[in-house]
Amino acid sequence: MEFIHRPVMLDEVLEGLNLKPGGVYVDCTVGGAGHGEAILKRTGAEGRLIGIDRDPEALAAAERRLVPYGKRVDLVRANFEDIGKVLERLGQTGVDGILFDLGVSSYQLDNPARGFSYKRDSLLDMRMDPERGPSARELVNTLTAEELARIIKDYGEERWAFRIAAFIVEERKRSPIETTGRLAEIIKKAIPAGARREGPHPARRTFQALRIAVNRELEVLGGALRSAVRVLRPGGRICVITYHSLEDRIVKETFRRLASPCTCPKEFPACVCGGKKEIKIVTARPVVPSAGEVEENPRARSAKLRIAEKL
């Protein structure tokens, strides 16, 4: 299956990064390099791109796409939480801009072999790095009902979390839950018929929750953003695209803390805690895709872009 990357809010990202000729930019979720190639085109012959991804198939696709740019590109297999270590290994002391395009890619969702989607029956997996960490199959077959319910409730914001977890535990007693199709059917049975008639597919929230847990997406995000800000040069921009409220909340709160670090009580006449502002927030409200983009690419519908600048 071909890895096709349709970059979300491309023009908004390029403007948000405030690109300059000869600059060094990091795409922390390089994927198929849709954003990355556009950055290279806009930064001239001396511009550089460092692309990070933990999915080897994504990196292979990026490498194929970026062949014409030769030594201007460094592609690294890593988790974006290790951005500092990646730059250190490359001998890069600072960068001019950083992009995070969070969540799962269309390729990962659409490729049955990756086991992400409830729409295609396949072996349950959901790992962005298919060689590391427990898969979703392992989680649903080993965690207690309480542990599963907490994941589904916290990461999926699913009102029927405890009922779904109970059904999963009961069903796996008969035989291990191995496929996306069987898991989706179990979830569908767990949710009352009246609730199933409302909103999106009944398995959507649970699948999202399991994917987030498998890949530690929210667990590492805040730290990754702080690490990214540390390696930005003054005036450098960080752009973050999120796709659900949990991600966006973390980005918003992390930016707020970095922009207003004072922890002194409000009644203090002056700051004595020594907190130092690291960024200024460029987007008071998140940027969202245009109606035209959503029509062309429905998966962009929930995207939000937040931008900050290093002081």
UniProtKB/Swiss-Prot annotation:
<keyword id="KW-0949">S-adenosyl-L-methionine</keyword>
<keyword id="KW-0808">Transferase</keyword>
<feature type="binding site">
    <location>
        <position position="80"/>
    </location>
    <ligand>
        <name>S-adenosyl-L-methionine</name>
    </ligand>
</feature>
<protein>
    <recommendedName>
        <fullName>Ribosomal RNA small subunit methyltransferase H</fullName>
        <ecNumber>2.1.1.199</ecNumber>
    </recommendedName>
</protein>
<dbReference type="GO" id="GO:0070475">
    <property type="term" value="P:rRNA base methylation"/>
</dbReference>
<keyword id="KW-0489">Methyltransferase</keyword>
<dbReference type="InterPro" id="IPR029063">
    <property type="entry name" value="SAM-dependent_MTases_sf"/>
</dbReference>
<feature type="binding site">
    <location>
        <position position="108"/>
    </location>
    <ligand>
        <name>S-adenosyl-L-methionine</name>
    </ligand>
</feature>
<feature type="binding site">
    <location>
        <begin position="33"/>
        <end position="35"/>
    </location>
    <ligand>
        <name>S-adenosyl-L-methionine</name>
    </ligand>
</feature>
<comment type="similarity">
    <text>Belongs to the methyltransferase superfamily. RsmH family.</text>
</comment>
<feature type="binding site">
    <location>
        <position position="53"/>
    </location>
    <ligand>
        <name>S-adenosyl-L-methionine</name>
    </ligand>
</feature>
<keyword id="KW-0698">rRNA processing</keyword>
<dbReference type="Pfam" id="PF01795">
    <property type="entry name" value="Methyltransf_5"/>
</dbReference>
<dbReference type="GO" id="GO:0005737">
    <property type="term" value="C:cytoplasm"/>
</dbReference>
<keyword id="KW-0963">Cytoplasm</keyword>
<feature type="binding site">
    <location>
        <position position="101"/>
    </location>
    <ligand>
        <name>S-adenosyl-L-methionine</name>
    </ligand>
</feature>
<dbReference type="InterPro" id="IPR002903">
    <property type="entry name" value="RsmH"/>
</dbReference>
<comment type="function">
    <text>Specifically methylates the N4 position of cytidine in position 1402 (C1402) of 16S rRNA.</text>
</comment>
<dbReference type="InterPro" id="IPR023397">
    <property type="entry name" value="SAM-dep_MeTrfase_MraW_recog"/>
</dbReference>
<dbReference type="GO" id="GO:0071424">
    <property type="term" value="F:rRNA (cytosine-N4-)-methyltransferase activity"/>
</dbReference>
